């Protein structure tokens, strides 16, 4: 993760997964999640991943802030296996308010969770 102070944490629950054929005999999974992120209230989103032990992914979400505002978020990142049915993820994301963050987290398939932290870029 880029140098800087931790801006916040997130805790997401995976709510569903949709599998579709991908390029070159790959399989894509759309992972839907919901939860909370520090300073961004309730978050609902979807990441699209090429199924495997490592690879790229992209995502988009909507953040429903406590003050009633809505902020959107898009990201691109990579993942790699970090244990049995666990994956470590790193991404760079852009909020519609102009803020850019570096994100690190871990997905746990058994628990159906994605938890991590983010740091705002200066």
Predicted regions and their residues:
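Beta-strand-enriched cores of mature, soluble protein domains
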Residues: 1-122
């Amino acid at each position: 993760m880029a140098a800087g102070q931790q801006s916040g944490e997130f805790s997401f629950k995976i709510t569903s997964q949709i599998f579709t054929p991908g390029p070159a005999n790959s399989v894509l999974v759309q992972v839907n999640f919901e939860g909370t992120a520090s300073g961004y209230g309730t978050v609902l989103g979807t990441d699209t991943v090429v199924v495997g032990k490592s690879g790229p992914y992209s995502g988009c979400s909507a953040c429903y802030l406590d003050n009633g505002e809505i902020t959107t978020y898009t990201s691109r990142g990579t993942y790699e296996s970090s244990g049995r049915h666990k994956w470590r993820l790193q991404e760079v994301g852009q909020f519609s308010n102009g803020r850019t963050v570096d994100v690190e987290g871990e997905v746990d398939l058994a628990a159906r969770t994605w938890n991590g932290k983010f740091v705002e870029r200066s």
